[in-house]
Structures are given as C-alpha cells and as structure tokens.
Amino acid sequence: DPHTAAFHPDGRLYFTTQGAGMLGRLHPETGELTEIQTESRPYGMQVAANGTIWVAYNGTNKLGALDPETMEVRYYEVPNGASRIRRLGLTSDGMVWYGNSTQGRIGRLNPQTGEIKEWPSPSGPESRPYALAVVDDVIWYNESGMRPDALVRFDPETEQFQSWAIPSGAGIIRNM
C-alpha cells in the first residue's frame, strides 16, 4: 500500500507504506528494493536540500528523519501524544513544517536543536490541517475540518495567518 513517494537527488525513489508501517527505497536502474519497519502509519514525505528524507507519521506524534544511505530513522516527538501528522514541508532555512491534524495546529521543527513550536490554526482545534506546501518560505495548508475546506497562508516571519473558504464542496484537499 505505497502512499507517498519522493525522488532523491541520487535517483532513488523513497516511499511510505502507511498500512504496513514501512519505509521503502527503490533503485530504478537496478531494481533493488529495500524496506524497513518504522513507526505507525508513515504518511507524507519530503526530501531536504541536504538529502535527508523527512517523514510524517499519522499513527503517532512523531516526525522522522530517514538517512538515505543507512535507512536509519531519527524520530522527533511533537507535543501532545494525541497529535497526528499527515503532511510536511521544508523551508530554505532547513526548518520542517507540519500540520497537526488532531490538535488544529501547525508546527515547526528545528532539526539542529530539536526545538518545536506550534501555532493554533485560525479555525481552531477542530480545523484539522491536512495538506501542506511551502512556497517562497511561506506555509500554505488546508483546514479539512471546515465545511467548506479553508485554504490558509502562514508567514513565518510575521507569524500572521490569512485564510479563504474554498466553496467547491468537492471534499478534502489531501495534497498540495
């Protein structure tokens, strides 16, 4: 059940398998496939500029930094054991941004210090941030708990939010 995939600059494909609780690596040229057991429900994935592969875990309150060579994962716990993360994004300063869907918050992990800071999403604890993208170091995400969904922009420099209702009625935005 591969869920999210990302190509690494070295040409290998890394992926999450949410139901199986595994991370995988495929070398397209040789067909070599490596899979490892990991924390519960690995979901979103992003490759950082330094080559680290960041993983969001939807079954725990953790983020993971996967070493592409050793396939070892360093875990970072986010506040509140009930937190769940589906998607994440990376800014040019190396920060890891995530939507905390069960707590209605967005957060930032500093991988150098392990420090985590969270901000409440504009629509509150039931807003359920889901998809997340970083554009020009500004965080964009949706609040999937709202009807209709809301699109939210967060500027890390000013710590200001803007949001817009998405009137399509088409359901939940799951990826950006």
Regions found by a protein language model. Name each.
Residues 22-25, 61-65, 104-108, 149-152:
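A short loop-to-beta-strand structural motif that recurs across blades of beta-propeller domains
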Residues 50-52, 61, 69-72, 92-93, ...:
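Tandem repeat domain/solenoid detector
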Residues 13-19, 53-60, 96-102, 140-146:
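Conserved beta-strand positions in repeat-built beta-propeller and related beta-rich domains
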Residues 1-10, 39-50, 81-93, 124-136, ...:
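Beta-rich, blade/repeat-based domains predominating
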Residues 32-37, 72-78, 115-121, 160-166:
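A short beta-strand motif characteristic of beta-propeller blades
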Residues 1-13, 25, 29, 54, ...:
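Short intrinsically disordered, low-complexity coil segments enriched in acidic
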